[in-house]
């Protein structure tokens, strides 16, 4: 059985809170990852628009959207799911805690919102979230859920267990390489204290980290395990 992962698209924050020079405001989108294990082909966090996701699949993996068996979101944020519509036949998966807790918050906001346009947007998000199944603990051989709450209420990464190392698709639990270097969580986290706990747990378990809005990072705290 071959376990393989690759980055389809490197994400970016709208405003990088740890950069001195910000430049122009960017459209945020999460890093998108393809995981292949057994008979499953899983896209994690399709944050770019559908035409771009389709192009990245072809360029990076020689695949079509129809080849994807599952889509997994580490968090139910718009910048994690812009490309969802291109995978209508795949299973849409999210952690049960994220689905239930975010669903409750969306319903509460909907009931309190007075603006009709805002209510329509909330209604769409609620309907979209209902399409998601609660992800099983094991999505595929050697690809298991790893809860990282804090960035969002039920944020959950995907832990890939290779023969000599662990790779964690961490989502917003680790924002960027700068956040890892400085030991910081994303400023707009839902629960900063809980996010810091999850951040520490990521460092303890992952040899390689796929962050929420950056390229793959080697965890120097555990690199000795890989190289000697």
Language model features with spans:
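Core dinuclear metal-dependent hydrolase active-site scaffold
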Residues: 7-8, 30-36, 42, 134-163
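Metallo-beta-lactamase
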Residues: 96-147, 153-226
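Pre-active-site segment of Zn-dependent metallo-hydrolases
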Residues: 15-32, 37-70
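Divalent metal-coordination and catalytic microenvironments
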Residues: 35, 45, 68, 75, ...
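Zn-dependent metallo-beta-lactamase
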Residues: 1-39, 201, 205, 221-228
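Active-site metal-binding loops of divalent metal-dependent hydrolases
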Residues: 10-12, 46-48, 76, 97-98, ...
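Active-site HxH/HxHxD metal-binding segment of metal-dependent hydrolases
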Residues: 47-128
């Amino acid at each position: 059985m071959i376990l393989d992962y690759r980055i389809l698209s490197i994400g970016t924050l709208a405003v990088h809170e740890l950069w001195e020079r910000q430049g122009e405001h960017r459209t945020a989108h999460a890093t998108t990852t393809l995981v292949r294990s057994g008979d499953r082909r899983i896209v994690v966090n399709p944050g770019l628009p559908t035409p771009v996701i389709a192009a990245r699949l072809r360029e990076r993996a020689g695949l079509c959207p129809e080849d994807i068996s599952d889509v997994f979101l580490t968090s139910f944020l718009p910048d994690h799911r812009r490309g969802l519509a291109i995978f209508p036949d795949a299973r849409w998966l999210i952690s049960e805690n994220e689905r239930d807790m975010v669903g409750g918050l969306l319903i509460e906001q909907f009931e309190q919102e007075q603006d009709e346009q805002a209510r329509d947007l909330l209604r769409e998000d609620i309907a979209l979230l209902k399409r998601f199944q609660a992800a099983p603990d094991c999505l595929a051989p050697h690809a298991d859920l790893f809860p990282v709450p804090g960035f969002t209420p039920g944020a959950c990464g995907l832990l890939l267990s290779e023969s000599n190392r662990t790779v964690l698709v961490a989502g917003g639990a680790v924002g960027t390489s700068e956040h890892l270097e400085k030991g910081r969580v994303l400023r707009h986290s839902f629960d900063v204290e809980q996010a810091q706990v999850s951040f520490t747990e990521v460092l303890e378990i992952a040899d390689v980290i796929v962050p929420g809005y950056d390229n793959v990072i080697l965890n120097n705290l555990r690199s000795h395990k890989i190289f000697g």
